[in-house]
Each structure stands twice: as structure tokens, then as C-alpha cells.
Curated annotation (Swiss-Prot):
Sections of the chain in a coiled coil: none
Membrane topology field: Multi-pass membrane protein
GO CC field: plasma membrane
Family that this chain belongs to: Belongs to the L-rhamnose transporter (TC 2.A.7.6) family.
Domain of life: Bacteria
GO MF entries: rhamnose transmembrane transporter activity; symporter activity
Primary location class: membrane
Protein name from the UniProt record: L-rhamnose-proton symporter
Subcellular location: Cell inner membrane
HAMAP family cross-referenced by the UniProt entry: RhaT (MF_01532)
InterPro entries hit by this protein: L-rhamnose-proton_sym_RhaT
Keyword Glycosyltransferase: no
Length: 344
């Protein structure tokens, strides 16, 4: 396995670790509605940071974006909005299926759809089937999916042992939402594929290869921001128990604390895709679809490890932890299989 591929896998792991940890600061926010907290964090992660980083990277910010036609920008924006819809459905999936089943189904579907649909859309899926390296990477995707399934099973055993139940368990509604979440969340993978002309233009301007994907986040995350912020603002305006004014009428020290914690959560959320861009840049072009598989499987892996570190599994018993450990090992094996496939 080449050093470039190894570094690509490592950057994806770091990005996934940030994704697995980003909600920790949000959990410390007090006396704010979820909608206010999510909006503040979202403004930081989806608007401020993408624009700021792009302004630092590009020699002429406005000239760069105005150089693209609407036919180039619109798919990137719409796929970003598609991801935003998946993001909203994610929370509802947890509500009706519980954390473990919801995450397992949603992540499993988005891993498959986001990974395999890209080469199908690009018309080169047959190359993957007919080459040794392609077949090995596909095997890695399958093994990763098995690993996600094992971790999901561990979560179910943990919830059963600890008596944790879904907020409003509804299998039919939850499955529909999980499938929708999985499909729509893959919009981020599709957006990255559609944004290739933007990456190439950034490279032509002298932007370092590690950073060429970052300017496209202004458009991708702009689409996601409109969906997420629109959802939050509509709820803040229509739901009687929610009030943006009330949330910002608390004592000033608490408001400052909540803003800083939400901003930190937003920063950590953004960092997952900052390092995703770094990892993506190191993956061979013919296997760039693998970036999504690495990100999602490492997200599950890091989520399990973070849960152990935070002692969320302390009262789960030995069996769930053993199953979780097995799932994590399988995901690590999958990453190695994919790495060897890309190197062959």
C-alpha cells in the first residue's frame, strides 16, 4: 500500500473521529431548544467556516465562483440540499427506531448508495467488476457493511441490557425514514462527485491538492444549510413551546457559554469534511468513490470507541462490548482490504 493511500485512509479516520465527537459540546448546552442550538452550530459549520476557508485559499473569491455556469453549480447545490434532507431525517429515524437500529439501517444504506451509485452514474462500474483492484475494493465495501451490522447488533444488545427504548417506537414509520435518511444522506457523496470541475478549477489556480475540494463546500453546504436552517426556523416560528427570543433572553454568561459550545460543535462538524477533503485528495481517482465508504464505516468505528471512552457501555455487560469490539475489528479489516485493492 503506497504512502499516499495510507495517508488518505488516515485523514478519513481523523475526519470520522471528529464526526463521532462533534455532538459532545452540544450536550453541554443548557436551557436552549435543540433548534436554536443546531442553528447556531450550523451557521458556523455550514456558512462561516466554508466561506472563511475558501476566502483564505482562493486568490479571487468572487471570480472563482462566477466562473462556473449554473449548470455546474446547480447539481452541486441540489445534492447538498439532498444531504440536508437526510440530515433532518436522521434525528427522526432515531426517534422511531432507537439509536442502534436507526444508525445501523441509515448508515448501512447511505454507505451502499453513496459508495456504489457514484461509479454507476459515471459509467465505470464494470471496470470495478472486471479488475482485480476493483473487485478487492468492492469486497472491502461488503466487509465494511458487515462490520457496521455487527456494531449495530452490539448497540441493540446494549440497549436491551440497559433498558433503553426508542422515544416512540414505530417500525413501519422508522424503516421508511431510515431508508430515506440513508438515500438522501448520500447526497454529500454525489455532491463531491458533481463538484469535480470546481476542484479542478481550484487546482488550476494553484490551490494545494489537499485543499482543492474545500471551496466547493460553500455551494454544497449552502444547500444543506438552507434545508437545516429552514427546518429549524420554521419550527421556532410555529411551535408554541419554542422561542428564539426566550433562548436569547437568558443570563448573558449562559448565552455566551451556549454560543461558544454550539460554535465548537459546529467547528468539529466542519472538521470531519475538512479532513474528508484531505483524504479524498489522496485516494486514486479511479477509486474516489471509496472515500464515502471509508468515512461512513470509520464514523461507526469511532462512534463505538468514543462510547467506550465516555463509559456509555459501562453497564452494558461483557457480551455487547465483545460484539462491539468484533465489529470495530471487522471495519479495520475492511479499510485494509480497500487499501490493498486501491494499491493493486
Amino acid at each position: 500500500m503506497s504512502n499516499a493511500i495510507t495517508m488518505g485512509i488516515l485523514w478519513h479516520l481523523i475526519g470520522a473521529a471528529s464526526a463521532a465527537c462533534f455532538y459532545a459540546p452540544f450536550k453541554q448546552v443548557k436551557k436552549w431548544s435543540w433548534e436554536t442550538m443546531w442553528s447556531v452550530g450550523g451557521v458556523v459549520s455550514w456558512i462561516i467556516l466554508p466561506w472563511l476557508i475558501s476566502a483564505l485559499l482562493l486568490p479571487d473569491f468572487w471570480a472563482y465562483y462566477s466562473s462556473f455556469s449554473l449548470s455546474t453549480l446547480l447539481p452541486v447545490f441540489l445534492f447538498g440540499a439532498m444531504w440536508g434532507i437526510g440530515n433532518i431525517n436522521y434525528g427522526l429515524t432515531m426517534r422511531y427506531l432507537g439509536m442502534s437500529m436507526g444508525i445501523g439501517i441509515a448508515i448501512g444504506i447511505t454507505l451502499i448508495v453513496g459508495t456504489l451509485m457514484t461509479p454507476i452514474i459515471n459509467g465505470n462500474f464494470d471496470v470495478l467488476i472486471n479488475t482485480e483492484g476493483g473487485r478487492m475494493t468492492l469486497l472491502g465495501v461488503l466487509v465494511a457493511l458487515i462490520g457496521v451490522g455487527i456494531v449495530t447488533r452490539a448497540g441493540q444488545l446494549k440497549e436491551r441490557k440497559m433498558g433503553i427504548k426508542a422515544e416512540e417506537f414505530n417500525l413501519k414509520k422508522g424503516l421508511v425514514l431510515a431508508v430515506m435518511c440513508g438515500i438522501f444522506s448520500a447526497g454529500m457523496s454525489f455532491a463531491m462527485n458533481a463538484a469535480k470541475p470546481m476542484h479542478e478549477a481550484a487546482a488550476a489556480l494553484g490551490v494545494d491538492p489537499l485543499y482543492v475540494a474545500l471551496p466547493s463546500y460553500v455551494v454544497i453546504m449552502g444547500g444543506g444549510a438552507i434545508i437545516n436552517l429552514g427546518f429549524c426556523f420554521i419550527r421556532l416560528a410555529k411551535v408554541k413551546d419554542l422561542s428564539l427570543k426566550a433562548d436569547f433572553s437568558l443570563a448573558k454568561p449562559l448565552i455566551i457559554q451556549n454560543v461558544l459550545l454550539s460554535a465548537l460543535g459546529g467547528l468539529m462538524w466542519y472538521l470531519q469534511f475538512f479532513f474528508y477533503a484531505w483524504g479524498h485528495a489522496r485516494i486514486p481517482a479511479q477509486y474516489d468513490y471509496i472515500s464515502w465508504m471509508l468515512h461512513m464505516s470509520f464514523y461507526v468505528l469511532c462512534g463505538g470507541i468514543v462510547g467506550l471512552v465516555l463509559k456509555e457501555w459501562k453497564d452494558a455487560g461483557r457480551r455487547p462490548i465483545s460484539v462491539l469490539s468484533l465489529g470495530c475489528v471487522v471495519i479495520i479489516i475492511a479499510a485494509n482490504i480497500v487499501g490493498m485493492g486501491m494499491a493493486s
